[in-house]
C-alpha cells in the first residue's frame, strides 16, 4: 500500500504531515501516474518508484527552506515545487517551465487537489521577469550549477538564496561556479529507499 509506505518514509525523515497532506501527496502520485501514460511527464513509470524518486526526493529539502516566497525553475511536472507546497502551506511557490503540457498538468493538480499556494507559469527562465523577487530559487535536475546561476541570477531577492538539488557533486562542476556566487552550505540528504547520493547546495550572490 502506497499510504503505508508514505507513512514510513515520512517517519524516517521525521517530517510530520496531516491526513490531508498525506492524501494530497498520494493523489499527486496518482495523477502523475495517470497523466504520464499520455503526456510522458517523467521517465519514472511505477507509482512506488515515483513516491521515492519524486515525492521523498523533493520532501527531504523541506526542513532546509528559509523564507516565504519560492520559485521552482525547470519544475517539469511540479518537482520539487508541488510536494514542497503541500507540506508548506505557509509558503508560496511559483512553478516555472517552458513546456505547456507540464504547466497544464500542474494547474490540473492544483485544481483537483485544492493546492492554493502555487502558481504555474509557462516561460523560459531567462525570459521570466517577476514583479517581486524570491527568498529561494529551487532547481532540481534542471541544469548544471553554472547554468542555473547564470540563467537565474535575476530571480532572488536581496537576501535570497539558491537551492541546488544535486546527485553526485563533481569537483569540476563546483569549480565552474561563476564569480560573484558563494556556496554557503553543502548538505548531504538521505532519501528513504534511495541508494544514491543526494546533496543540497545553498548559494548566495556576493
UniProtKB/Swiss-Prot annotation:
Q: Does the keyword Ion transport apply?
A: no
Gene3D superfamilies the record matches: Vaccinia Virus protein VP39
Per UniProt, the enzyme's principal EC class comes to transferase
Catalyzed reactions per annotation: guanosine(527) in 16S rRNA + S-adenosyl-L-methionine = N(7)-methylguanosine(527) in 16S rRNA + S-adenosyl-L-homocysteine
Any single GO molecular-function term of the entry would be: rRNA (guanine-N7-)-methyltransferase activity
Enumerate the subcellular locations listed in this protein's record, separating them with semicolons: Cytoplasm
| Keyword annotations from UniProtKB, A to Z | Cytoplasm, Methyltransferase, rRNA processing, S-adenosyl-L-methionine, Transferase
Q: Which family does it belong to?
A: Belongs to the methyltransferase superfamily. RNA methyltransferase RsmG family.
Q: What is this protein called?
A: Ribosomal RNA small subunit methyltransferase G
Name its species. Shewanella sp. (strain ANA-3)
